[in-house]
Amino acid sequence: MAKKGHIHMESGEIINFELFPNEAPNTAANFEELANSGFYNDVTFHRVIPGFVSQGGDPTGTGAGGSGKTIKCETEGNPHKHQAGSLSMAHAGKDTGSSQFFIVHDPQPHLDGVHTVFGQVDKAGVEIARAMKNGDKMTKVHVFDEE
C-alpha cells in the first residue's frame, strides 16, 4: 500500500506526492501526523530559492519554528537522492528535524546523506514549486493510503 498525499496551495494549485515509509519510516510518519492533524494548514513556504528549493512547514514563517518535537535523520541506507521533486526534511543540524521540509527544484547532490529524503512530488508539482515565491501559502496538506 502506497502513502500518497496532496499539498493544497492558496492559489488553488495542488502538489501531489508519494511518501517513502520503507526508506524513511519515522520521517514519513512524522510528516503524515503533522499533515493530517492540520499542522501545515495556512503555513507558508518561507524560503524559496530559485533553482534550489522551496521550504515550508514553519508555523512562525521565519525559518526558526517547528512542531516542538525533533526526529532523527534517516539518511543511512536511504537510497533516495536529492533530485528534482524530492521531499526532504529540513534541520538545523543532525537529528534536529521537526516540521520544516523542502521540495527540491533541481538536483542537489551536496544534500545527499545530510538531509532525509522522505518523498517525491510529481512533475507538475515540481513546476509549482519552481514557480513559488516567498510567502506562498499551503491551505491544507493531507496524506492517505492508496492501494
Where is each model-derived feature located?
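Cyclophilin-like peptidyl-prolyl cis-trans isomerases
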Residues: M1-E147
